[in-house]
């Protein structure tokens, strides 16, 4: 893939140039930044990017992950054997609903192989979760121990990479944890699981304040993007940052905001090396991550 990056560099224009520049920023960050965040949204895990992300974590390109509940849902469902099939953006959604199928973009997922698979996985672990107070990164590690190394959570657990999920209740895993606590009231007289998100914040505070230089690859937007740049401001901002997104900035959304906007908030340093790649992540992330593996 490094040959592709070099080709993009020679093309020297438009988003090809931005991809080549993003590679250079991330390559330097691997050698200079001791804290390297990887932020991505859950929809990417519904694609084959899941295995590429897992490889990047096995290679320890990054040592902190911030993601969404959907990433856990798709990662677990796939590990449990759920079928994710290629489809079309133009499929009839009413017909899909009648057939018991979900559509995520142009990926089709069986309704019975999504939520139920995730719920079964979580509920099978209720016994060892009851009565404990866990941060989301600790829950992710607990789940990762039981998942294969080609999964994101499995790779992260084996590599010692913390996975933070600030919006963990916003998905099948969160609902399954609620069901887990409902079962605890019936079977154990109230020995519930407590998900302590402030414990996550304490850990992030230690990571950020303990780091010398901060880097981030941020794919997509939303809570996973903002949580990284929010914490970076308490260290003076990110030193290296690459955004990959197709969102626009002109509606004032966080998802479309460029790195330069984060400078005004103190979340990216004025001296930071930054690149914004306006592209579908499924097109450019494999190139960047594969080129970086082994560096």
UniProtKB/Swiss-Prot annotation:
Per the record, its GO cellular-component terms are:
cytoplasm
**Which cofactor does this sequence's record say it needs?**
NAD(+)
Q: Name one GO molecular function term.
A: deoxyhypusine synthase activity
**Keywords attached to this entry:** Hypusine biosynthesis, NAD, Transferase
Query: What Enzyme Commission number(s) appear in the record?
Result: 2.5.1.46
Active-site residues (renumbered): 267
**Reaction(s) this enzyme catalyzes, per UniProt:** [eIF5A protein]-L-lysine + spermidine = [eIF5A protein]-deoxyhypusine + propane-1,3-diamine
Top EC class for this record: transferase
What pathway is this protein a component of? Protein modification; eIF5A hypusination
Question: Which Pfam family, any one of them, does this sequence belong to?
Answer: DS
The family note in this entry says: Belongs to the deoxyhypusine synthase family.
Q: What's the stated role of this polypeptide?
A: Catalyzes the NAD-dependent oxidative cleavage of spermidine and the subsequent transfer of the butylamine moiety of spermidine to the epsilon-amino group of a specific lysine residue of the eIF-5A precursor protein to form the intermediate deoxyhypusine residue.
Query: Per its record, how is this protein called by name?
Result: Probable deoxyhypusine synthase
What taxonomic classification does the UniProt entry list for its organism? Answer: Archaea, Thermoproteota, Thermoprotei, Thermoproteales, Thermoproteaceae
The gene behind this protein is dys
């Amino acid at each position: 893939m490094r040959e592709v990056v070099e080709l993009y560099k020679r093309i020297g224009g438009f988003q090809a140039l931005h991809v080549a520049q993003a590679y250079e920023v991330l390559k330097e960050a691997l050698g200079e930044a001791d804290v390297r965040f990887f932020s991505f949204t859950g929809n990417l895990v519904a694609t084959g990017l899941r295995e590429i992300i897992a490889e990047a974590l096995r290679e320890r390109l990054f040592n902190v992950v911030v993601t969404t509940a959907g990433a856990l849902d798709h990662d677990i469902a796939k590990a449990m054997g759920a079928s994710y099939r290629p489809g079309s953006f133009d499929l009839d959604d009413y017909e899909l609903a009648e057939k018991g199928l979900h559509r995520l973009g142009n990926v089709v997922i069986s309704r019975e192989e999504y939520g139920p698979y995730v719920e079964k996985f979580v509920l099978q672990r209720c016994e060892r979760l009851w009565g404990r107070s866990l941060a989301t990164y600790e829950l992710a590690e607990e789940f990762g121990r039981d998942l294969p190394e080609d999964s994101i959570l499995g790779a992260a657990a084996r590599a010692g990479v913390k996975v933070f999920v600030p919006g963990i209740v916003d998905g099948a895993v969160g609902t399954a944890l609620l069901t887990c606590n409902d079962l605890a009231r019936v079977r154990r007289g109230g020995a519930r699981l407590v998900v302590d998100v402030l414990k996550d914040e304490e850990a992030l505070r230690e990571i950020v304040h303990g780091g010398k230089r901060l880097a981030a690859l941020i794919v997509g937007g939303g809570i996973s993007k903002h949580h990284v740049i929010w914490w970076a401001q308490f260290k003076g901002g990110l030193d290296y940052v690459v955004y990959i997104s197709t969102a626009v900035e002109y509606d004032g959304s966080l998802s479309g905001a460029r790195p330069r906007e984060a400078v005004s908030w103190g979340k990216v340093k004025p001296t930071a090396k930054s690149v914004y790649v306006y592209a579908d992540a499924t097109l450019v992330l494999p190139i960047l991550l594969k080129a970086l593996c082994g560096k």
